[in-house]
Regions:
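Selected transmembrane alpha-helices and immediately adjacent juxtamembrane segments
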Residues: 143-183
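Structural signature of hydrophobic alpha-helical transmembrane segments
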Residues: 1-14, 36, 56-74, 121-134, ...
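A generic, lipid-embedded transmembrane alpha helix
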Residues: 36-52, 103-106
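C-terminal ends of transmembrane helices
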Residues: 16-29, 74-89, 139-151, 200-210
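Membrane-interface helix-loop-helix junctions at boundaries between adjacent transmembrane segments
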Residues: 55-67, 74-127
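Cytoplasmic-side transmembrane-helix entry/capping segments in multi-pass membrane proteins
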Residues: 30-40, 86-100, 123-130, 151-165, ...
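Hydrophobic core of alpha-helical transmembrane segments in multi-pass integral membrane proteins
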Residues: 102-104, 126-142
Length: 223
């Protein structure tokens, strides 16, 4: 049962990750960015976790997902502002965004565990995270940014690599859920594999304007 849940969840995530780049490429940053955040990766991850977790553990895993998406929004803010403000290259922006995600995610993971251990309701905690995510997404998209369509196709090998990265992240999340690490599995299920590979693939194929134009709508769509 565990292996089946992992494989199905990972396969769905990999397929969606591949389609996201194509959506942004075809429809432009605004429409494609929102399409990229349709919850077709967290749904199979949630189904996989539900099938192998207790009710309490599943609630704990899901309660941290809005916080994880908020961390992803901050991750995307790095991609919007770091290249212009600090003149970072694609490599530098990638490293900085991952460091920011790891640092904030780690602090939030510890805080989430302690807050809910003290008796704070999982649903209320999740709704608090959702509220913060919506505010952050609105703030990031309040000022319109250029969101051009792509003019060059992303190479098939890049699509395969990004689909594989997303599949691995979701597979690990479901596996950790089976080991009774609900908070860790919930956070890992939101690891920005799709966002990261979208940014890298589109930057390489189209230049930095296309992925930066998509980042804001991705943040708001994640809510």
């Amino acid at each position: 049962m565990l292996q089946t849940s992992i494989l199905v969840s990972a396969l769905f995530a990999g397929i969606v990750a591949t389609l996201v780049t194509i959506a942004i490429e075809r429809f432009g940053g605004r429409t494609g960015g929102v399409l990229a955040t349709i919850p077709t990766t967290i749904v199979p991850a949630a189904l996989g976790m539900y099938s192998i977790s207790s009710e309490t553990e599943f609630a704990q895993s899901m309660s941290i997902v809005p916080f994880g998406m908020m961390v992803n929004a901050i991750f995307l803010l790095v991609w919007i502002h770091a290249p212009q403000r600090w003149g970072l290259s694609l490599f530098g922006t990638t490293i900085l965004s991952l460091l920011v995600w790891t640092a904030i995610g780690s602090v939030g993971l510890v805080a989430s565990s302690q807050i809910q251990s003290s008796g704070f309701d999982a649903f209320t905690y999740a709704m608090s995270g959702l509220g913060l995510l919506i505010v952050l997404g609105l703030w990031a998209t309040w000022t319109s940014r250029p969101a051009p369509k792509g003019h060059r196709s992303v190479r098939p090998m890049v699509l395969i690599l990004r689909g594989s990265a997303a599949a691995i992240a979701i597979g690990i999340a479901v596996w950790l859920s089976g080991l009774s690490y609900p908070f860790i599995s919930g956070l890992i299920s939101t690891f920005p594999a799709i966002f990261l590979t979208s940014m890298i693939a589109l930057w390489l194929a189209q230049g930095q304007d296309v992925p930066q134009g998509a980042a804001g709508p991705m943040m708001l769509g994640g809510a």
